[in-house]
């Protein structure tokens, strides 16, 4: 591994690009704390009130809630088309922030594969979001549950769109970490989804040296967040090495389709190499 390869995919500063404005951010921050408190309060109230409603009602109300609290979600497809396009499929997305689940939960039929969450705040927020959106999740670390869920899904795939982030780590939006095939080779078609996030003040959503709670709070206090989800053409399910290539070659094709759409490189840098690089910076 070359450090230059990892550096390409990691932000090292909190503010990036021509629009960076740390002074304006500092002036905004006290008001941002109030915005964060309002967002959490509204989410708690909404989650309690919406529980008696159907999943479909929860989904559409959740989208309105996000808009109300300053989180905009747009897509190249309308709600019903997304539902048809992703039904029974694995939806593979690039991973760009600790808030990626916010827009994914607004999508029809969405079930998320969830890893560990670093902070208590993240766990509480995740609980509220899943309850409020009517979505389900599969815990990656619970192998017994995963085996059971995949067995059930194989028998009856209709009504579930499984959202995954095959990089298994967050990139800096200027390139993709290599996709892991174990997220994608599941006997179901794969729908690549190219996700982008726009933030004010030139904020970086994922500085490599920031803690999980710091990244979470910066996004929560941001005046606006704009996620855009572009659903790409479906890639047929993996069949065999003779027909689909090796599992890793299959995953590379999914990665390449997203990278090409976003106009960024699809690298072979792995999550493990990023973790090694970050650990080396702390020595």
Predicted features by range, described:
Residues 1-89:
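Membrane-anchoring hydrophobic helices of lipid-metabolizing enzymes
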Residues 1-16, 74-78, 101-102, 112-114, ...:
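Soluble, non-transmembrane catalytic domains of enzymes that act on hydrophobic metabolites at membranes
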Residues 42-47, 51-60, 67-68, 72, ...:
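Catalytic core of membrane glycerolipid acyltransferases/transacylases, capturing the structured
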Residues 77-85, 147-157:
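Short amphipathic alpha-helix with an adjacent loop that forms part of the alpha/beta core around
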Residues 134-154, 165-169:
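A membrane-cytosol interface segment of integral membrane proteins
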Residues 250-261:
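Short amphipathic C-terminal alpha-helix that caps PH/PH-like domains
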């Amino acid at each position: 591994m070359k450090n230059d390869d990892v550096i390409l995919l990691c932000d090292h500063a909190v503010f990036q690009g021509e629009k960076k404005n740390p002074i304006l951010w500092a002036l905004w921050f006290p008001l941002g704390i109030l915005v964060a408190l309002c967002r959490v309060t509204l989410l708690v109230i909404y989650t309690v009130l919406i529980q008696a409603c159907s999943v479909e009602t929860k989904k559409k109300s959740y989208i309105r809630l996000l808009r109300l609290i300053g989180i905009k979600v747009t897509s190249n497809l309308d709600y019903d088309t997304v539902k048809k396009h992703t039904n029974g499929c694995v939806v593979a997305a690039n991973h760009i922030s600790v808030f990626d689940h916010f827009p994914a939960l607004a999508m029809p039929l969405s079930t998320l594969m969830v890893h560990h969450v670093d902070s208590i705040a993240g766990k509480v927020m995740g609980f509220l979001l899943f309850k409020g959106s009517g979505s389900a999740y599969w815990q990656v670390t619970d192998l017994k549950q995963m085996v059971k869920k995949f067995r059930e899904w194989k028998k009856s795939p209709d009504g579930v769109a499984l959202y995954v982030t095959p990089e298994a780590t967050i990139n800096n939006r200027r390139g993709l970490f290599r996709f892991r095939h174990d997220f994608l080779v599941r006997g179901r078609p794969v729908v690549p989804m190219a996700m982008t996030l726009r933030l004010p003040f030139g904020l970086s959503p994922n500085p490599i040296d920031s803690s999980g709670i710091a990244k979470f709070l910066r996004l929560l206090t941001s005046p606006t967040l704009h996620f855009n989800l572009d659903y790409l053409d479906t890639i047929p399910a993996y069949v065999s090495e003779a027909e689909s290539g090796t599992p890793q070659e299959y995953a590379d094709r999914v990665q390449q389709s997203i990278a090409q759409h976003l106009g960024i490189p699809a690298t072979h840098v792995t999550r493990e190499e990023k973790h090694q690089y970050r650990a080396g910076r702390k020595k």
